[in-house]
Amino acid sequence: MRLPKEGDFITIQSYKHDGSLHRTWRDTMVLKTTENAIIGVNDHTLVTESDGRRWVTREPAIVYFHRKYWFNIIAMIRENGTSYYCNLASPYYLDSEALKYIDYDLDVKVFADGEKRLLDVEEYERHKKKMNYSNDLDYILKENVKILVDWINQERGPFSQAYVNIWYKRYIELKNR
């Protein structure tokens, strides 16, 4: 599979552990690809839910996916500052159809003022039982929550305002070509 290039548009598909399609984002612009990571941007991107409902993202958001970490990061650029929505999820897989990952329900939200919240713990526990998450998977996900919180606290990668500014500026340059 050829890696997408800067300026290409890709589809993103999230699945649940049982293989069911959860959500699809159409036309995410790729800003950078490396052997292990893809950085992109969603800006007024069409999102389709598994039940067929559709909506459009409200603000530009830098998205970060990695082949080794069990999370992905969405940096939402808003008037009052950058806030983050982080999905605990499998490392991504890329094929000719889309960038794909499994969403494991647990989420970390970081507000523009720095407040952090772990979300959807009950949903995670419910799906863990229903979809038979293994003990190994449970351990991996909980360890990756710790890694993610360390990244947040250290303002590493996507959690650095300089990172967000650089990639947003690059998006504007590509958009205005």
Swiss-Prot record:
Residues holding Mg(2+) 1: 87, 103, 107
Class of enzymatic activity (EC top level): hydrolase
Enzyme Commission number, as recorded: 3.6.1.15, 3.6.1.6
Active-site residues, as the UniProt record annotates them: 23 (proton donor)
Binding site for Mg(2+) 2: 105, 107, 120, 123
UniProt keyword list: Hydrolase, Magnesium, Metal-binding
Protein origin, superkingdom: Bacteria
Disulphides: none
Cofactor: Mg(2+)
InterPro entries given in the database record: DUF402 (IPR007295), FomD-like_sf (IPR035930), Ntdp-like (IPR050212), SA1684 (IPR016882)
A UniProt-annotated Pfam family: DUF402
Family to which this protein belongs: Belongs to the Ntdp family.
The protein, known as: Nucleoside triphosphate/diphosphate phosphatase
Organism: Streptococcus gordonii (strain Challis / ATCC 35105 / BCRC 15272 / CH1 / DL1 / V288)
